[in-house]
Amino acid sequence: MLLTPKMFSSWLRQDVKKILKRKDSDAGERGKALEDLRASLFNRFRSPETPKRQQQQQHRICGPTVALTFNFVVAISIIFMNKWVLKNIGFEFPVFLTFIHYIVAYLLMALLKSFSLLPASPPSTKSSLLPLYTLGIVMSLSTGLANVSLKYNSVGFYQMAKIAVTPSIVFAEFLWYRKRVSFMKVVSLTVVSVGVAVATVTDLQFSLFGACVAFAWIIPSATNKILWSNMQQRENWTALALMWKTTPITLLFLVSMIPFLDPPGALSFNWSLTNTSAILVSALLGFFLQWSGALALGATSAITHVVLGQFKTCVLLLGNYYIFGSNSGFISVGGAFVAIMGTSLYTYLNTRGQSLKTSSSSSALSEKKSRFSDLKDDDKNLEPYGSEAV
């Protein structure tokens, strides 16, 4: 049978149609698979359970030891960097420097959000908006007033004011959350406070305005730490998600503080490449300081974070004495050692309390499991009579 050109062309068209149809079906299946994958990923990352899961993952990856170590290293680094910026470069605008820190932090978080790397936030309700606004306002007051206090007061007076934050946190947490502190922890906190006071008593230089700023900073600082800790532990916020929500509010209030607390002339500053680079490095460290502080507060408590700050002061004082040969005096060095002993005692009490909680919870869980297995055994024994029961 001869194959005519017309028959050949018709067969060819049929084959092409079959191939195209098969390709369309394959493409449709592939597109459907991609849509299903996209939907599953969206549900996984944006479901109501996602913030809680991400917070649990944050605690697994960054536990108390990692978070406190991270915050300790970054805090010491930014102290030297900010000292370089404020003294050597001559950037005498502490609130504006804080504003730059938060601007850089917000840009970095926006970059993370554009790549879908920013953790999801818990569902917003009317009752959850008030703590967010409160935290944003308190953060602006805490960080802004802290830098102003460092400008007008010595480091010793700044640390003496920080001692008052510890009893403020204990009193506020008792009023708001009915948290109680054991007698031994009160003793260890007292030892830490006395040690820091003795260590910094030789460096108490302040002005009247600086003293007013330092005492005005105590309540916002204590409130800031309490809110950061409790919003992460009770409302399933991660550190970065909470920073993303509160930073715009903080920036708004920092702008309103600049005319009252900063001298004029920030825009006429010598913005050379060296000066700008130093300020940007300080801002980058500021982002890491805020992030590490949030991680530490979420993993531990507000009091533990304050104790870490006082321990950092004593380590810096001893480092200057032993490494750089600074003449701090034997009284200051002795006070630093006393404060470190109090910090060690507080850490031991916290660790023992957490281990006791873990053991009690595990024993309670095993007891529940044993009771459940006993009930299952009883059901199995009664099973032959179950069909006759009415």
Swiss-Prot record:
Protein known as: Nucleotide-sugar uncharacterized transporter 1
Any Pfam family the entry gives: TPT
Residue ranges with Basic and acidic residues bias: 366-382
InterPro entries (alphabetical): Sugar_P_trans_dom, TPT_transporter
Keyword annotations of the record: Membrane, Sugar transport, Transmembrane, Transmembrane helix, Transport
Compositionally biased residues, Low complexity: 356-365
Transmembrane segments: 61-81, 89-109, 128-148, 155-175, 182-201, 206-228, 249-269, 278-298, 306-326, 329-349
Chain positions covered by the region annotation Disordered: 356-390
Entry GO CC: membrane
Membrane disposition: Multi-pass membrane protein
Family of this protein: Belongs to the TPT transporter family. TPT (TC 2.A.7.9) subfamily.
Subcellular location(s) of the protein: Membrane
Main location: membrane
